[in-house]
A protein has these predicted regions:
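Active-site-adjacent loop and "lid" segments of alpha/beta metabolic enzymes
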Residues: 5-6, 12, 27-36, 58-77, ...
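Short gly/ser/thr-rich secondary-structure transition/capping motifs
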Residues: 1-5, 86-87
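Conserved, mostly hydrophobic/aromatic
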Residues: 21, 41, 45, 105, ...
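Glycine-rich phosphate-binding "P-loop"
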Residues: 48-50, 54-63, 77-84
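Structural preference for beta-strand elements that scaffold enzyme active sites
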Residues: 16-20, 47-50, 83-85, 103-104, ...
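Catalytic domains of carbohydrate-active enzymes, especially glycoside hydrolases
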Residues: 36-54, 231-234
Length: 280
């Protein structure tokens, strides 16, 4: 499986990491600060960087995304070798960001906004269709989300193909919303292999931590790392995370013990990460 990005094919035979560069509307920070953060994520093991605006309530304003995100996209694209993704539902932001150097679109609305399908078909860049975070699941977690996820993604993929978007430019992300019950999230992770039937690259947004009744797990990252490894083993190609260094180290280690090919090179990669951490 592969993606065509920046005029070349990127193989996805091994898991990739997408660093999440989160921007807040009222945040005081220069474009150079975000470029520095992106470079740090690249050094820690990210191949991709996603740039998105996060608000406390509701959805970001289109004007805020244009003024805040596009300059950062341009600077990161010009100053790193990362594959830059823009996270947005607005066609105008998609167009401006791709013009500034983004080579991938992540749409939390799965191209349902007016003009989004036509814009992506015209831009001819890969797009990631994210599951609808407005769909609620019961608080007891007895509802298996996979039926809703499969039906939703099937409908959105069909809409993309009917709009003239090349199937080779489609990715899917079944991630549930932050407010979804942990039981539903774990059921989703446990059944990820079901989505292999779509035969499309799959991304997964991994949280800083996975909620758990145990306070120890609430405060530590171990559960999220374990879930990440299970996701990759179940067919996820790209992990989206703010915690790039920890995820990269876990994936490198998993690769080293899971793959018989080139174990020495993988082991050296792990050792170099430890050395960088101690040096800092």
């Amino acid at each position: 499986m592969k993606l065509h990005l920046k005029g070349e094919d990127l193989e996805l035979y091994s898991p990739r990491i997408m660093g999440a560069l989160v921007v807040h509307p009222g945040e005081i920070g220069s474009v150079e600060d975000f470029v520095r953060k992106a470079k740090e994520m690249q050094e820690d093991g990210a191949d991709f960087i996603e740039i998105g605006l996060q608000v406390e309530e509701g959805i970001p304003e289109e004007s805020d995304e244009l003024t805040k995100l596009v300059p950062i996209v341009k600077a990161v694209a010009q100053n790193t070798s990362l594959y830059v993704a823009i996270t947005t539902k607005y066609p105008s932001v998609m167009k401006s960001a791709v013009g500034a150097g983004a080579c991938l679109i992540i749409d939390p609305d799965a191209l349902k906004a007016k003009g989004a399908l036509e814009t992506v078909a015209m831009l001819k860049v890969p797009v990631c269709l994210v599951f609808d975070h407005n769909i609620d699941f019961d608080t007891e977690g007895s509802l298996d989300p996979m039926g809703d996820i499969s039906a939703y993604l099937y409908e959105r993929i069909d809409a993309c193909l009917n709009a003239g978007i090349d199937r080779r430019n489609l990715l899917i992300d079944p991630s549930l919303s932050q407010s979804a019950p942990i039981e539903s999230k774990l059921k989703l992770i446990g059944r990820l292999e079901t989505l292999k039937s779509f035969a499309l690259p799959m991304t997964m947004a991994m949280p800083r931590s996975i909620p758990h009744a145990d306070n120890y797990l609430n405060e530590h990252f171990s559960a999220a790392v374990a879930a990440c490894l299970f996701c990759v083993n179940s067919g996820v190609n790209i992990i989206r995370t703010e915690r790039v260094a920890e995820m990269a180290l876990a994936l490198d280690t998993w690769q080293a013990v899971n793959k018989s090919a080139r174990p020495f090179k993988l082991t050296k990669a792990i050792a170099s990460r430890f050395k960088r951490k101690h040096a800092n």
